[in-house]
Amino acid sequence: MSYARQMLDTYPGTVGVDAAVLAAAIDALSDCAQACIADVDADLSEQNLAEMVTCIRLCLDCADVCTATLGVTSRQASYDASVTRPLLQACVAICKSCGDECGRHAQMHEHCRVCEQACRRCEQACRELLATLK
């Protein structure tokens, strides 16, 4: 069981959404942010750096959006769907864009393939959480 799920299960108040879906999204957001940061580092070490500029930019944007969304979704007190919903929507959009870009490099760079997978998983987890919001 992930730490996100353990924290939700031990939360003294009411969690307003399905804890399993929320925990999966929190875990995916964390993994995606980390994968994007690591991919940027790997991209900067590639010989063809000029070809990686768009990938680097999207990975940085994706990591930032995922990190912000991770923080908001991890807090349950005074939950406000009007704040959470647009962040999740932004996360879906940037994860799709970043995943698409990393996918273009996946055949040449294994780190891009891994990042693409993290982006796709996060995009799906955010979609699933969005579907449960009231």
Regions found by a protein language model. Give the residues of each.
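Amphipathic alpha-helical hairpins
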Residues: 1-134
